[in-house]
């Protein structure tokens, strides 16, 4: 803990339960729910609520475990924007689509909400699926794989999915897919050290309109700024790079962040609790067990349009284990809350608090 920084990371709770490494955490966008996935082939869900009326302290409770039926590691988990559907990506090459029985908008995400049921299994990848994600409209789902492809699926009524494109732009394993927060722009990151950006041509198909090069090793993770004007990427080269949209289809590298001694496996860009002038808070984590929290701010300088200030840092977040995932809570009242998943099988919830 760095006392010379303005904030610290306070551990809210440990959430044990996975029998093997925990790979990813995902907050439900509409309900007080958190999901995690693991090498134990399961997805666990947790609800949270204030400990007392008006209190900032939260109580997390295990709601249920989805025995996904995947035959190998569940590597990725993602919520649809409605909060009612969950997608899982597995090393068995398949993508599972899950819905909860008898779910209603009035329930409080407790045990009475019904069991999760696999409504669709999407097949097509030849080998390990590494990442899944829904577009902001909820009408598209992307998946990527060690088979070097990115698939885009159209979400249709009654849990029907149609493949809209198989994108074969990367020359190596594709590690991550991330949708723009408001537009139908998809980004992917790869073992080939590049980031690809895709859009749909109404007269043609989905295509790659830009390749962002600059990382010197595997690109592990991507996260868009909340307003979508910037894209952050993290890499095996121990850097985070931030890219700015300078034209409709043109992105330019503007800032590099350092602060890790090993691969940066996961990043998450949230709105934060700062002033309206800043672009939010960027959390980074990885193989060195550190979590760094950066405040990103736009400047008036043409040559250096962004500045970054380290707000908080913690080492050994999961003891001696790698940290595989970090994610900010999307609910504005909890914009200072983040979750992590580690090789120790634990999910942890943290809050950024001023010293």
Model feature map: region roles:
Residues 43-48, 95-100, 150-154, 177, ...:
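WD40-repeat beta-propellers
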Residues 25-31, 77-83, 133-139, 178-184, ...:
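Loop/turn segments within WD40 beta-propeller blades
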Residues 37-59, 102-103:
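Beta-propeller domains
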Residues 37-40, 88-92, 137, 143-147, ...:
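Conserved strand-to-loop turn within each blade of WD40 beta-propeller repeats
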Residues 2-19, 58-63, 114-117, 308-311:
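A short helix->beta-strand "capping" segment at the edge of beta-propeller domains
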Residues 327-355:
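Blade-level signature of beta-propeller repeat domains, shared across WD40, Kelch, NHL, RCC1
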Residues 15-22, 66-74, 115, 122-129, ...:
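WD40/WD-repeat beta-propeller blade N-cap
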């Amino acid at each position: 803990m760095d006392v010379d920084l303005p904030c610290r990371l306070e551990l809210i709770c440990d959430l044990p339960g996975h029998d093997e490494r925990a790979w990813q955490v995902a907050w439900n966008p509409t309900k007080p729910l958190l999901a995690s996935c693991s090498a134990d082939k399961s997805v666990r869900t947790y609800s949270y609520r204030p400990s007392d009326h008006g209190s900032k302290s939260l109580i997390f409770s295990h709601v249920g475990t989805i025995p996904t039926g995947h035959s190998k590691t569940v590597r990725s988990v993602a919520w649809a924007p409605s909060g009612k559907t969950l997608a899982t990506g597995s090393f068995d090459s398949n993508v599972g689509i899950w819905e909860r029985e008898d779910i209603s908008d009035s329930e409080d995400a407790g045990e009475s909400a019904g069991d999760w049921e696999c409504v669709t299994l999407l097949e097509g990848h030849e080998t390990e699926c590494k990442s899944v994600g829904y577009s902001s409209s909820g009408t598209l789902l992307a998946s990527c794989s060690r088979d070097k492809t990115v698939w885009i699926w159209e979400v249709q009524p009654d849990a029907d999915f149609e493949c809209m494109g198989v994108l074969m732009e990367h020359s190596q394993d594709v590690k991550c897919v991330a949708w723009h927060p408001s537009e139908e722009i998809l980004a992917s990151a790869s073992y080939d050290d590049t980031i690809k950006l895709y859009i749909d041509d109404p007269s043609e198909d989905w295509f790659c309109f830009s390749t962002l090069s600059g990382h010197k090793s595997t690109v592990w993770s991507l996260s868009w700024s909340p307003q979508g004007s910037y894209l952050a990427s993290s890499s095996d080269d121990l850097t985070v790079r931030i890219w700015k949209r300078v034209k409709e289809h043109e992105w330019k590298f503007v800032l590099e962040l350092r602060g890790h001694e090993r691969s940066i496996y996961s990043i998450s860009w949230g709105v934060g609790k700062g002033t309206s002038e800043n672009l939010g808070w960027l959390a980074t984590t990885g193989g060195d067990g550190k979590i760094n929290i950066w405040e990103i701010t736009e400047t008036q300088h043409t040559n250096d349009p962004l500045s970054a200030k380290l707000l908080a840092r913690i080492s050994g977040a999961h003891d001696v284990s790698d940290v595989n995932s970090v994610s900010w809570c999307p609910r504005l009242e909890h914009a200072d809350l983040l979750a992590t998943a580690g090789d120790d099988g634990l999910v942890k919830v943290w809050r950024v608090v001023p010293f």
